[in-house]
């Protein structure tokens, strides 16, 4: 019995090792960039990331580098999924999760993201300090803390963080008003999204500029000299042009789709949704002493959610001006890149038309030369026919042997007259044929 138990224990150990190996294979490295800007590498599995961001598995598959997905920006309840060219990220209200990569372009993108987050955090901290200094001389609108019970202390701390229309949270950046009251600091998720859009648009713009620098000289050289090497270069350039145009078009279509759908843009306000959730939790704690009022509010919330889910809230228009301006700016940029590619495509098409015209002209010249040679062949054949007639073995006076010098001279004269007459007749026939061809428009 003991050996069998040992064998069973060995089988269980092998199963655990296989499970551990499968779990290790399922996990991957993620580069996490929090609101503080200090990036760190974490190893997490798919289920851990799903629990952390609230994303379904199909959204995480968009970030798989082994799978080919078109450019996509998905707004979910707790995260934004970004798949733009080589930029793949999961953006939450407090951090950005990036699939770790050794690509130099990825390292440059991470540096830009950290710099943007740190700069925005510094500006936000300065504005928060200035606003606290301005509000220190104003009487606080909240009651003084008279009790130190845990519930009241937590509730008072959350309420006291709402000053001057700004909600402060230790776990995420906030949307704060600037000193002039006009400019607003974008929330963390929009700053991260802006870096993603900027990186993707800049990458496509650089590829387009490189293609333009190679394409225009190659096309001009092809128009001046048609050769196999130049044709191969233009063929490769056209293939790259088609590929880049498709990628740029996908990014443009995705931005246009977001701009057309206000509800999708409203879903991307992660910080605002989290702030409303915190305020709702605080209000529920305040109203916990009045169960009847809590029940009424709960019924109203349920009815409002049902109306929104059923589409009966027709007049609802979310507050999306900030995100709309952000997306419009990069939509204009990517549309300009697409226009450059369209102009390059038109230039390629014009070059192809010009080359086809040149080739048609060469073909017409060859056909004209063929007609001229064919006509000359017909005329020469007519002359050969005359020679064949005179070469027949028929007794005529022209072939009679001369008996004296006078007949000999006359015979030679007839020979040259016949020869020159045949040549002149063939020449006249050729000239007449060419004149008729030009007059009828067949020849130039």
Curated annotation (Swiss-Prot):
| InterPro entries in the record | MRS2-like
Entry keyword set: Coiled coil, Ion transport, Magnesium, Membrane, Transmembrane, Transmembrane helix, Transport
Q: Name one Pfam family in it.
A: MRS2-like
Which molecular function term from Gene Ontology is one that the record holds? magnesium ion transmembrane transporter activity
Alphabetical GO CC annotations of the entry are:
membrane
Record keywords: Coiled coil included? yes
Residue ranges of coiled coil:
195-258
Q: Where is this motif: Required for magnesium transport activity?
A: 391-393
Compartment(s) where it occurs, according to its Swiss-Prot or TrEMBL record: Membrane
Q: For bias kind Polar residues, which ranges apply?
A: 145-155
Membrane topology type, per the record? Multi-pass membrane protein
BP GO terms, sorted: magnesium ion transport
Record carries keyword Membrane? yes
Q: Where are the transmembrane segments?
A: 370-390, 415-435
Q: Where in this protein does the record put region Disordered?
A: 128-155
What binding partners and quaternary form does the record give? Answer: Interacts with CYCB2-2.
* UniProt family annotation: Belongs to the CorA metal ion transporter (MIT) (TC 1.A.35.5) family.
PANTHER family per the record? MAGNESIUM TRANSPORTER MRS2-F, RNA SPLICING PROTEIN MRS2, MITOCHONDRIAL
Job description of the protein: Magnesium transporter that may mediate the influx of magnesium.
Please identify the protein, giving its name as recorded. Magnesium transporter MRS2-F
